[in-house]
Amino acid sequence: MGRLHDYLRGAPDGVAALVSVELCSLTFPTVKPTVSGLVGTAMFGDGAAAVVAVGDRRAERLGATGPDILDSRSRLYPETLHIMGWNIGSAGMQLVMSPELPAVVEKHLADDVTGFLAAHGLTTGVVGAWITHPAGPKVITAIAATLDLPAEAHELTWRSLGEVANLSSASVLHILRDTIAKPPPAGTPALMLAVGPGFGSELVLLRWH
């Protein structure tokens, strides 16, 4: 979403599409399966999502509704390559997911989110919608704890995880769809938040109109 925003800033009359296709079942350990490998892949599902967005001038002409993308931020955390990813070899793709993952989230994410919001004169308390990637129960819990969020902030995230599992990058777009279906009031700021291999985080600031 951040890159979509970057493109449309330079093309205010343009239309752009973002497509995510995730085949997480490719990591299913058919050769020398392990308990950790089976448990890890059981958290994931195959999925796809697409977003069509327009530049500012086109949106104004169309009278478009929904969220505006205000800003984005990407962070890559040092010495965290082992936290999440894949090992690719002759037996296929092997999922890598360290038990340290929630601790890494707790260590880094709060400063990133609060600093990003502060740059726009905002705090976590005024964010009306949290569109958070369902990276797993422990990670969702860690995000909520480190940001001191109320239980209802991640209602759609928990629902998505329970209904379709973790669809990798497509998941946060599915949660965006559900948020758009029952939008917050006009003028409400919202934050899209995802974590992934690297290990890193992606933040996208939205505002409904």
Residue ranges and their predicted role:
Residues G10-A16, L38-V39, G47-A48, A64-G66, ...:
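Short coil/turn connectors at secondary-structure junctions
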